[in-house]
Amino acid sequence: MRATREAFGEHLPVMGEKHRDIVALDADLGKATKVASFRESHPERFFQMGIAEANMIGVASGISEYGYKVFMASFGSFLTGRYDQIRCSLAYSNRPVVLVGTHVGMAIGKDGVTQMGLEDVSIMRALPNMKILNPASYSEAIKVIEYLCETELDSPYYLRLGRQPVEDWDMPFEFGKGQVIADGEDITIFATGCILGDVFEASKIIEETTSMSVRVVNMPTLKPIDEEIIVECAESTNMLFTVEDHSVVGGLGSAVSDVLTEHFPAKLSKIGLNDVFPESAPPADLYEKYGLSANKIAERVISESMG
């Protein structure tokens, strides 16, 4: 089990050797976000900006004007706190900059709500030009980083990474596409990011305790969302659920709901943080209290599907 932030720390320097146009910026959190590893291998293309995310965003925009691809890293909650700079200097200016937000969701546990990225997807989804990636595993994060480094970016990206070690799902990655990782005919559960393992475990609990079969769909790209797979699942299964370690307001659930409203009205239940601020506690305790543990996800799906 490995964290998605580790993939960033280990693979960005590798890609930096291959692509000399990659630059990395740090906001004094390099050991936590893992961007510090880029300084060790490519010090001439690494810049320490200090505790100054707003300035870092402006600098990243300026550097990108000279043909460089900039990766800038901080905690997701700290980046989104600089919304005006992101909006004007990156989204409005449409700069090829990758905002890397780590330590997202309740999974950071005892660090508390001020450090948890719980509304980051909502905020980034609202920005024109911004694209959003949320890999579920170390291996998928490697593929996402390769995509970002080897693609000629035409807009800013938000890359959402977790602190907690998770099961290493080795899945094919295609930008803008979801992947069916377990097929079923009765229920579809869409998941994004590091909670995928809990969702997969929940699907097994459901199948072992009921007669229902569960389709689990991984959604690593949150914007643009894969409309085709959402409609296909709505047409072929009886009920849809979304699960995310994020607020249910504006996240994966809202993105799926938007697609269904326009293209195929269907019943959808959103599982996530229900418009509240959680406490500071061990991640497992928070997941249990707020309905994101495998058992709680299974209970909710069974209750709403059979009720």
Task: Give the residues covered by each predicted segment.
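Thiamine diphosphate
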Residues: 1-158, 165, ...
